[in-house]
Regions:
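A short, highly charged nucleic-acid-interacting micro-segment common to nuclease
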Residues: 64-77
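Extended, well-ordered protein cores
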Residues: 1-4
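Repeated polar recognition positions within modular binding domains
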Residues: 53-57, 70-71, 120-128
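Leloir-type glycosyltransferase catalytic cores
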Residues: 133-158
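Hydrophobic/aromatic-rich core segments of domains that either
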Residues: 76-139
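Generic structural motif
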Residues: 12, 92-96, 149-152
């Protein structure tokens, strides 16, 4: 008789994420580089290791675990994964949400800039930087439907 595989506990998921994050920090040599380069390397790592997948019935697609461990996520998974790295390096960041989308704001070089890993991801393991560290004005020039957020929560954000 086969046994049904059990889902990992929350503690096990956290441990797996922590182990992977430590490996990524080492692999990408993140400790002795400037914040802009860190952000770019983390952005690219997540995009190279995550597939956008809203069709699975797995709740983990909404979390960093889905993005970093399982390799499948929706916008909240991308944003959560990115935030973990930003928090480790004490780079100020905020998760921003509209009615049905989520992305990040990062404070770098004296400015709050938007970064949307989900929208920088594309099929066939390719990605671009259209939503990489952009101002609010640039964000709104690219999209106003999914990125319409309540700006009053982010008064200082550009």
């Amino acid at each position: 008789m086969g046994t049904k595989s059990e889902k990992p506990s929350v503690r096990e998921k956290i441990n797996k994420i922590n182990e992977l994050v430590n490996n990524v920090i080492s692999e990408l040599d993140l400790n002795n580089i400037d914040d802009l380069t860190k952000i770019e390397r983390i952005h690219n790592y997540i995009l190279n290791h995550t597939v956008y997948d809203k069709n699975t019935n797995n709740f983990d697609i909404n979390s960093a675990y889905g993005s970093l461990i399982e390799g499948h996520a929706v916008c909240s998974g991308y944003a959560d994964a990115f935030s973990i790295f930003m928090n480790i390096y004490k780079i100020p960041n905020i998760r921003v949400s509209s009615e049905n989308h989520l992305w990040n704001l990062v404070y770098i070089n004296g400015k709050w800039l938007h970064i949307d890993l989900t929208w920088d991801d594309s099929e066939n393991n390719k990605y671009d930087n259209n939503y990489f560290l952009i101002t609010k004005e640039k964000l709104f020039s690219l999209d106003t439907k999914e990125h319409n957020f309540d700006e009053s929560f982010f008064i200082e954000a550009n």
